UniProtKB/Swiss-Prot annotation:
Protein name: Delta-hexatoxin-Mg1b
Gene Ontology MF term list: sodium channel inhibitor activity; toxin activity
InterPro entries: Delta-hexatoxin
Range of residues in the leader sequence: 1-26
Function: Inhibits tetrodotoxin-sensitive sodium channels (Nav). Intracranial injection into mice causes strong convulsions and death. Intrathorax injection into crickets causes paralysis prolonged for 2 minutes, followed by recovery.
Length: 70
C-alpha cells in the first residue's frame, strides 16, 4: 500500500509541475513597482514573477524605459 501511495504522490507532483510550466504566461500583479502607468509597471512585475519562477518575461529591459512616461 505504501508503495502505491508513493507512486501516486510522485505522479501528482510531476503533473503539477508540468501544468505550472504550461499555464499561460502573463504579467503578474504581485506588487505595484512604480507610481506611473501600468505599461511602466508591467515589465517589472513580469521580471519579479520570472525571478520567482511564476512566469516568463516577454518584455525586454528596453521596454521598461520606452514605455514609461517621461
Amino acid at each position: 500500500m505504501k508503495i502505491l501511495e508513493k507512486a501516486l504522490l510522485e505522479n501528482d507532483s510531476a503533473a503539477e509541475e508540468e501544468s505550472r510550466n504550461l499555464r499561460t504566461k502573463r504579467c503578474a500583479r504581485k506588487r505595484a513597482w512604480c507610481e506611473k502607468t501600468e505599461n511602466c509597471c508591467c515589465p517589472m512585475k513580469c521580471i519579479y514573477a520570472w525571478y520567482n519562477g511564476q512566469s516568463s518575461c516577454d518584455h525586454t529591459i528596453s521596454t521598461i524605459w520606452t514605455s514609461c512616461p517621461k
